[in-house]
């Protein structure tokens, strides 16, 4: 069975190529990608001390003023009493915000499916290069493995705080992690968080709450520019769908899910059928599922956004009469990128992925609407 997990991309390892049924079983359950970080100051503004001392190298993220904070989340509370110097992030997107705040991870989850030739996600790699970080200080690539987060591996990093606001850590994992350091989990449900809340949570935990508005404002300005330059986008609605192979169900991402939120922020309207499916959310996916036999519920949607695990997955889906007959599929009003890095980057809204993604996204959307 071919499957696309809403939050973790299909890998390219031998196991994923040869055992997709096994992957399908674990992909829609709690995932455990690991991103570990310690602080390394880079010249990204507002992170150094005012006295001009050299703060390069591992250590404090700059400045001694820090107001203790308590962050309440679904699994408990994280009391952070001192400015973190060794930060671990789990799940997706939080490491990018840390980088935008001037903190370079010393360890990052190995994300083969979306990585460039260096082994890093390209927007992360570009940020490291742009900031002149020595290769010896690049994050170490860490594999989470099938079992998810390893508390033993995290313990080796001696963290001051563990950030997992967009993750799927379980209560058992949380108990192990919080024994190591204050741990911030998701606000309410696994793998579900508003992108603004994620940025604010990470910034607050790192003693940079005042900069959260700056980062959010910068992202909103970029979205606004796209809408102003492409007013025609507002004339069309969309649904962002995924498939679980020819014999599995289909899914539609809800508006709060970050990849759907990105498209909406670029100017398209959420299709009514998506709004109607909010009550059918499958916990831990920020999406709702429906049978392929009912694919015609998408017939009134102007533009469909989707992605496939590979060309074989695309072909098997388009060969299905019920799927191939959907209006947008039939007309070609579909945005279905084949670049694994883009699929990954466009699934997250944060200070690094948005500028990297939107210039690539706009031409795809323009092409899709020419088919309407």
Where are these regions (language model features)?
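Ligand-binding pocket segment of bilobal, Venus flytrap-like solute-binding proteins
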Residues: 272, 279-311
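A short, structured surface patch at a secondary-structure boundary
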Residues: 95-151
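Alpha-helical, coiled-coil/dimerization segments enriched in small aliphatic residues
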Residues: 252-286
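Bacterial lipoprotein signal-peptidase II cleavage site
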Residues: 43-65
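Extracytoplasmic substrate-binding proteins
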Residues: 77, 176-247, 347-372
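Structured C-terminal subdomain patch of bacterial secreted/periplasmic proteins
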Residues: 298-372
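Secretory targeting and sorting signals
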Residues: 2-51
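Proline-aspartate-enriched helix->loop->beta-strand connector
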Residues: 154, 158-164, 182, 295, ...
């Amino acid at each position: 069975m071919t499957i696309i997990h809403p939050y973790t991309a299909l890998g390219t390892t031998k196991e994923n190529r040869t055992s997709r049924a096994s992957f399908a079983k674990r992909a829609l359950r709690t995932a455990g990608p690991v991103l570990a970080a310690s602080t390394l100051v880079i010249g990204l503004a507002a992170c150094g001390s005012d006295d001009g001392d050299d703060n390069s190298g591992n250590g404090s993220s700059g400045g001694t003023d820090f107001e203790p904070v308590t962050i309440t989340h679904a699994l408990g509370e994280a009391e952070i009493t001192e400015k973190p110097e060794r930060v671990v992030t789990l799940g997706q997107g939080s490491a990018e915000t840390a980088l935008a705040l001037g903190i370079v991870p010393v360890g990052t989850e190995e994300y083969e499916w979306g990585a460039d030739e260096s082994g890093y996600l390209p927007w992360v790699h570009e940020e490291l290069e742009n900031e002149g970080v020595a290769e010896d200080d690049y994050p170490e690539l860490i594999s989470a493995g099938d079992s998810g987060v390893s508390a033993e591996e995290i313990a080796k990093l001696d963290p001051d705080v563990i950030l997992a606001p967009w993750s799927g850590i379980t209560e058992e994992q949380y108990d192990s992690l919080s024994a190591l350091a204050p741990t911030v989990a998701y606000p309410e449900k696994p793998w579900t968080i508003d992108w603004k809340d994620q940025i604010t949570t990470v910034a607050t935990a790192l003693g940079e709450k005042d900069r959260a508005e700056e980062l959010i404002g910068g992202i909103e300005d970029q979205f606004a520019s796209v809408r102003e330059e492409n007013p025609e986008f507002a004339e069309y609605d969309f649904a962002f769908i995924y498939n679980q192979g020819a014999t599995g169900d289909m899914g539609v991402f809800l508006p709060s899910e970050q990849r759907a939120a990105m498209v909406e922020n670029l100017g398209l309207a959420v299709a009514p059928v998506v709004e109607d499916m909010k009550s059918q959310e499958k916990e831990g996916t920020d999406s709702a599922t429906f049978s392929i036999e009912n694919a015609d519920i998408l017939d009134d949607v102007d533009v469909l956004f989707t992605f496939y695990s590979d060309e074989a997955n695309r072909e098997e889906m388009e060969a299905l009469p019920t799927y191939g007959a959907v209006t947008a599929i039939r007309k070609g009003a579909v945005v279905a990128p084949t670049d694994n890095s883009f699929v990954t980057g466009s699934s997250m809204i944060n200070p690094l992925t948005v500028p990297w993604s939107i210039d690539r996204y706009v031409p795809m959307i323009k092409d899709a609407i020419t088919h309407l």
